[in-house]
Amino acid sequence: MKSNILILFCCFLFLASCQAPSIEEYTLLPHPVDIKYIPGMVKLKTQPTLVYPGELANEALLLQCYLSSDFSVQATLKKNKKKGDIILQLDPAVLPEQAEGYILDATSGNIVLKANSPAGILNAIQTFRQVLKVKDGRLIVQKSTLTDYPVFSWRAVMLDEGRYFKGKEVVFDLLDEMAALKMNVFHWHLTDDQGWRIEIKKYPKLTEIGAWRDSSEIDHFGSNRYDGRRHGGFYTQEEIKEVVDYAAKRNITVIPEIEMPGHASAAIAAYPWLGTS
């Protein structure tokens, strides 16, 4: 009897050892168009090599920075090489109808991010950041092939700084979050009744006067209650250029919003001749 129990127990252990490895499904935002999972994991080196063509220098540098900031992993960049642990690949045959589409291939010993445009590679990089995990000091990825492209060509966020000035660092943080979510249009509301936020050198009073107010209305519109605190600020033309460049490197187009002739009280306070009675 005991020998039979022992045999059954050994059979159970044998069957358990023959089961396929578990698959850890991704939790991604936004969710991709298609994922095909394969049992097993791709394990990258502790200091992986990142290879890329010259046209993807910006994208390679961004990915290197992400690996460092997100996972404390230092990747080595190798330009115009074919073999590496992480490969960025431009190929016009990849989803040719989808300018921002990409394929993330994690089926062998390395990771290949391929697309027909730098914009597609950037989207692949953002997904790659989400699927990566760290185990025993190494980056691992569930084996899979992931295909994705945006459903909407215009994926926008609007920041209203006409009413409340936020500052350049807040804008940079917002652009980073937009890039992570694959959003590609930044509506930048820079003027309104409550403030003028962009330097116009020919009309300096727009920022000397129009960018500042002595107090802000609180509770709700028309409450006639004010906080008594001075508020304001503006962006120089050089700072505007910095933001536009930062956004462009993340496939984000900046659309400045300038209110005229309505919602222009800040401009009229600076130059009364702009108004009518």
Segments from the language model and where they lie:
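Sec-dependent N-terminal signal peptides
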Residues: 4-15
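Hydrophobic alpha-helical segments and their boundary regions
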Residues: 5-6, 61, 236
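Acidic, contiguous N-terminal accessory segments
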Residues: 11, 18-155
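Feature activates predominantly on carbohydrate-active enzymes
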Residues: 95-277
